[in-house]
């Protein structure tokens, strides 16, 4: 299965340019699954501790109106997250989008940081805590949105449920890239699945500090590829049967 990860600009004008280039890359590579960064269709707002309802509603609207952008990735299956209003709550929701079926909710972010640059618990609430895999073409995918990935029991449970891919849309800073790659490698080892992540990237003088670097990690923790400023898109053809076989090897077969 051909999968694509990326790093996309937080700046609106640069994002538009990046999106056109991503669409061209996906078309050329004939990608089947594209993982997007966290809440990518609006500039990162949680850099500010003070919640702004006007900005929140603008972000929600931008994501609701993103279907034309997603169509540029078709026929690939696009995976990402959106800010949403649901049942009186503000949430960060993972989704799977395909031209044939449209937007499908997949998971609500559960673990929310609340610190400098990432005041997420001040901007929205945690979801229900439902970590249920979703189908994306021939792959079974388990979402862990950014901070969710550090709670590895969920990746292990995803592995027990047979997922081929752990999908981690991110918005993370420059000084933590190595740490997040460690998280991806650990998630792949405990699940026996490929781990994919895409991140946003900001300008040096932007208020938001977002460091880019998407990655694809194999089912045993081997880093298969990284994105960079020079190569912001990475597409690999994954043999999903390797994830299926990995479930029967150490440490996945060990019962808790």
Q: Where in this protein do the model-derived segments appear?
A:
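Short beta-strand scaffold segments in enzyme catalytic cores
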Residues: 79-82, 92-96, 132-134, 214-216, ...
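Active-site catalytic loop in hydrolytic enzyme cores
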Residues: 85-161, 174-182, 245-255
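Extreme N-terminal starter segment of soluble prokaryotic enzymes
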Residues: 1-5
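Cys-nucleophile CN-hydrolase/nitrilase-fold catalytic domain and related Cys-dependent amidase chemistry
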Residues: 20-100, 174-185, 190-193
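Short beta->alpha transition motifs characteristic of CBS
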Residues: 42, 95, 107-113, 215, ...
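CN hydrolase (nitrilase-like) catalytic-core segments centered on the catalytic cysteine
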Residues: 59-78, 150-233
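Short polar catalytic/cofactor-binding loops
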Residues: 7-13
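Structural motif
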Residues: 33, 139-141, 165
């Amino acid at each position: 299965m051909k999968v694509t990860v990326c790093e996309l600009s937080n700046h609106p004008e640069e994002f538009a340019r990046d999106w056109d280039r991503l669409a061209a890359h996906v078309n050329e590579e004939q990608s089947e699954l594209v993982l997007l960064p966290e809440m990518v269709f609006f500039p990162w707002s949680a850099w500010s501790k003070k919640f702004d309802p006007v900005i929140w509603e603008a972000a929600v609207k931008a994501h609701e109106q993103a279907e034309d952008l997603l169509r540029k990735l078709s026929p690939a299956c696009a995976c990402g997250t959106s800010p949403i209003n649901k049942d009186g709550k503000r949430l960060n929701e993972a989704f799977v989008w395909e031209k044939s079926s449209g937007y499908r909710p997949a998971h609500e972010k559960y673990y929310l940081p609340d610190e400098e640059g990432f005041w997420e618990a001040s901007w929205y609430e945690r979801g229900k805590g439902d970590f249920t895999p979703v189908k994306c073409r021939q792959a079974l995918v388990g979402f862990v949105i950014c901070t969710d990935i550090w709670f590895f029991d969920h990746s292990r449970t995803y592995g027990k449920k047979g997922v081929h891919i752990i999908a981690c849309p991110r918005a993370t800073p420059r000084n933590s890239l190595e740490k997040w790659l460690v998280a991806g490698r650990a998630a792949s080892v405990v699940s026996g699945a490929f781990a994919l992540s895409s991140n946003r990237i900001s300008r040096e003088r932007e208020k938001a500090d977002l460091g880019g670097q998407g990655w694809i990690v194999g089912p045993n923790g081997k880093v298969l590829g990284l994105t960079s400023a020079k190569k912001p898109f990475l597409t690999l053809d994954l043999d999903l049967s390797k994830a299926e076989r990995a479930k029967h090897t150490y440490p996945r077969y060990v019962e808790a």
